[in-house]
Amino acid sequence: QGAAAVIAEGGESGGHVGDLTTLALVPQVADVVSIPVIAAGGIADGRQMLAALALGACGVQIGTTLLRAAECPIHENYKAAILKAKDGDTTVTGRAAGAPVRLLKNPMAREYLRREKAGASLEELEHFTLGSLRRAVFDGDTRNGSLMAGQVAGMVHEILPVADILECLYSECRALAGVISGHPALETREGA
């Protein structure tokens, strides 16, 4: 049968990431596959959703913005850390080991990066982070937990029900689609 769709996830996303941004990745994938492409990474509002659709995606996958959902079962401390995050508050660990992970900067992430830069072995790094996601998600340990989040964390400001998050995403995307069609940059110019 094969795959029904493919998710093209850019490096802006939280968790395990690659090097290409969503803006660069999605059109390249859309150009070479004959199945639907779902864009992921760096999508928190209707502007970004509309951009993903313009790049050739049939839809989007959102992650970081759903971490703040009232129904999301992560610890309240993790949610609070997401809500406090600013635009530059994520980092990527694990590049040297070939398993890059984007997460919020905290003492655990800074220590991991220090050890990684100092040439720590893969085993040492794995031992250091063992259980860190559990510490974040279930225990609410924002100092020693792996607070995976994408670069859009700085755009997430309040806890809302999932239905409200999705409705805002869709309604903003639809409204902007109408606005962008009349954008001056898209007007035909005489003699151009």
Predicted regions and their residues:
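Active-site entrance/lid segments in N-terminal catalytic domains of soluble metabolic enzymes
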Residues: Q1-P36
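Conserved active-site-proximal phosphate/metal-binding subdomains
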Residues: T22-I38, A44-A192
